[in-house]
Amino acid sequence: MPSSTTTAPPGTHPNATASTVFAILGTVCWCVQLIPQIIKNYRAKSTEGLDTLFILSWVVASIPLSVYNQVQELNIALKVQPELFQALAFTTFFQCLYYGSKWPLRKALFVVISFMLFSGGLQAMLILTIKLGIRRHVEWPVVFMGVLATVLVNIGFLPQYISIFRARAVTGISYLFLAIDSSGSLFSFLSLPFDRWDVLAAVDYGLLFIIEMGVFVLAFIFNVLLKNKSTPTDEDVTFTEEDGDEKDEEYSDIFSIKGKFNTRPNAWQNAYDSDTKSAIQIP
């Protein structure tokens, strides 16, 4: 099976310096992107609005992404990127278990640390095995890792999108986190044409950037446009209060004995009441 990349070794392209700069920018963004979200969760002692499966998918997706970037000998910054990103994703996942699911501290730590050790061992095994296969011209595992990374990274947003449409609002997500994350995806994508063009890596970073921009669009629609339409203005509130007073008086007149069904003056009413009592009085 043909490889999804060119055969030129990394760093030999005339614009390799530009590729390195963009890759470093992308790595820096991806390394710090979750920090605003982690701080937000810590201060609120809550992960409400942040889907646990969304974060877990990123933890899992970092495994094939790291393996793919390593065996494809991409830019050194892109090799380090998934490892640092996964460490922050593990931290956020711990917060989801501890704050969101209310797990005991020891249980949450045990699960996360065990998962981290398993992930590290699995990555090392896959990298060695796939590189051995490449020497024997078996390249389909490389393509599989690239496709798996692309699917897992991007499908992780599906539960988040479902939560957004159900709530008709974007809540619990740090916009700074999304801005940094989408910038990291964009810079990583831009690093590819300047050195080694990798189709699967381009699809991964490019599609992730588009999906994250979609969250911003939904936030503008639900949190700004629709919210403003459903919120009455000051003029509407003033008119409603005055109109409500008039309605209250009208309803009071209707249901009052001395209201619309009582049109006689008080003097006539008193005389009428006296005559009535006299008429029914038994001698």
Swiss-Prot record:
GO BP terms, alphabetized: amino acid transmembrane transport
SMART domains: CTNS
Top-level lineage group: Eukaryota
Annotated PQ-loop domain residues: 15-81, 149-204
Gene3D superfamilies in UniProt: 1.20.1280.290
GO CC annotations, alphabetized: cell division site; cell tip; Golgi apparatus; membrane
Membrane topology designation: Multi-pass membrane protein
The keyword Transmembrane belongs to this UniProt entry's keyword annotation: yes
Record InterPro entries: LAAT-1, PQ-loop_rpt
Ranges annotated as spanning the membrane: 19-39, 48-68, 108-128, 138-158, 170-190, 206-226
Subcellular location: Membrane
GO molecular function: basic amino acid transmembrane transporter activity
Glycan attachment positions: 15, 228
Keywords recorded for this protein, A-Z: Glycoprotein, Membrane, Repeat, Transmembrane, Transmembrane helix
Keyword hit for Kinase: no
PANTHER family to which the protein is assigned, alphabetical: PQ-LOOP REPEAT-CONTAINING PROTEIN (PTHR16201:SF37), SEVEN TRANSMEMBRANE PROTEIN 1-RELATED (PTHR16201)
Protein name: Uncharacterized protein C2E12.03c
Native source species: Schizosaccharomyces pombe (strain 972 / ATCC 24843) (Fission yeast)
Lineage of source species: Eukaryota, Fungi, Dikarya, Ascomycota, Taphrinomycotina
